[in-house]
Amino acid sequence: MDYIDFLKNKMAISHNTGFDINDDELTPTLYPHVKDTVRWAIKGGCRAIFSSFGMQKTVTQLEILRLIVKHEKGKCLVVCPRRVVVEFETQAKEHLQLPVQYVRTMQEVEACQADIMVTNYERVRDGELGVRIDPQYFTCTSLDE
């Protein structure tokens, strides 16, 4: 076996587990690099996006979740540091005219009218009075930072 074959045997291939979207489903005002990232992530399914500061990661996440809700129905959850929650709410409204709601308990989750909810890591890890937000309730869960 030569070195190139050795390297090829070491490569892990990430298979697509998502779905295709049409270009007209994307929010038209998104930057081209955001549209490309959204298409790639939606088609791939389980994907991580490691974009630099200022590359609209929050908007990218929200657009991915919006399209997942459109195609798969159900609810989506963003789990992020508490200091980032307001950014998600603001970016969703400003760039996508999308309602996003902060939730603290499973009771709030179950009563929430928004398709996309945001909470902080402590609510999932520790909960409130021992009751944690259960990510399995959601069609999709997205982790930020």
Residue ranges and their predicted role:
Residues 1-51, 55-145:
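SF2 helicase/translocase NTPase motor core
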